[in-house]
């Protein structure tokens, strides 16, 4: 785990108590111990270094404590020599992160002055495939995911996005962010029609849209498209099983709202195409910067 996604912030004393599922995840799945260090992503997006201060197995709770005294408000200076509960903290204790930490990933992102925000218009596939797409898009740092009701979308797949499925997608996003260390607060929105999606994107400024096409007709070079102008937002539209119909390509490319791109590769599954397209665009933009 690169970071822990918290639903609330530390209190004025620099402590954060976690219960229930969070306790189970940290103590039973990750098996953290008192003194272990971990990065915590707060609701406001801030990344805070903390330590496991106290584990109460009877109450099924775990208390985290801020490591950086500068993060605690005036008059509430936190001593790292001792804690209000849980006893002694030793900052030399191990971190539970393996490899690159979330703070290192965040520093790299902050160094990029021309950071681009990514949006995915994903034509709704079968539920299991959508879960995989959401997971991979989150790991890649996509900000907004809009499920699109398309010509080839099955009615059952749209209905499946209601109720418990939405909660499951939020859980998938949280787990993907914790494992990848993504600083981006990825959101999955309610399903919308392709027409509504076009109207939404038309309102954007300094934005660019790309639709992945199975056909070579109307296709443009990805490099030329991304070199046209400086953009702050990029949207990638990806088809579901059956792809994007010619009628939908026409709607997206109308008024030059989206540019069609055909990759000269084998026919890709929709979940593969989404990851391939996101990675291709991000790689080019990173090289450009």
Question: What does each model-found stretch correspond to?
Answer:
Residues 69, 149-153, 265:
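Short, ordered loop/turn segments at secondary-structure junctions
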């Amino acid at each position: 785990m690169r970071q822990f996604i918290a639903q609330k912030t530390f209190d004025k004393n620099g402590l954060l108590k976690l219960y229930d599922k969070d306790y189970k995840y940290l103590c039973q799945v990750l098996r953290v111990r008192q003194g272990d260090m971990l990065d915590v992503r707060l609701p406001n997006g801030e990344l805070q270094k903390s330590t496991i201060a106290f584990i109460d197995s009877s109450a099924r709770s775990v208390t985290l404590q801020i490591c950086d005294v500068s993060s605690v408000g005036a008059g509430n200076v936190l001593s790292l020599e001792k804690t209000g509960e849980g006893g002694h903290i030793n900052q030399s204790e191990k971190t539970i992160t393996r490899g690159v930490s979330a703070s290192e990933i965040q520093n790299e992102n902050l160094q990029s002055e021309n950071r681009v925000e990514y949006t995915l218009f994903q034509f709704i596939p079968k539920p299991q495939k959508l879960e995989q797409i959401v997971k991979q898009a989150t790991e890649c740092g996509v900000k907004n995911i809009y499920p699109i009701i398309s010509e080839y979308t099955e009615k059952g797949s749209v209905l499946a996005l209601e109720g418990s499925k939405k909660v499951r997608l939020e859980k998938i996003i949280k787990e993907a962010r914790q494992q990848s260390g993504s600083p981006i607060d990825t959101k999955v929105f309610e399903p919308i029609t392709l027409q509504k999606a076009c109207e939404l994107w038309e309102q954007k400024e300094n934005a660019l849209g790309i639709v992945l096409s199975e056909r070579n007709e109307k296709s443009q070079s990805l490099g030329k498209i991304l070199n046209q102008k400086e953009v702050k937002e990029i949207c990638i539209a990806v088809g579901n099983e059956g792809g994007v119909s010619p009628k939908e390509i026409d709607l997206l490319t109308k008024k030059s709202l989206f540019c069609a791109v055909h990759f000269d590769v084998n026919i890709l599954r929709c979940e593969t195409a989404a990851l391939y397209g996101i990675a291709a665009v991000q790689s080019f933009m990173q090289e450009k910067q």
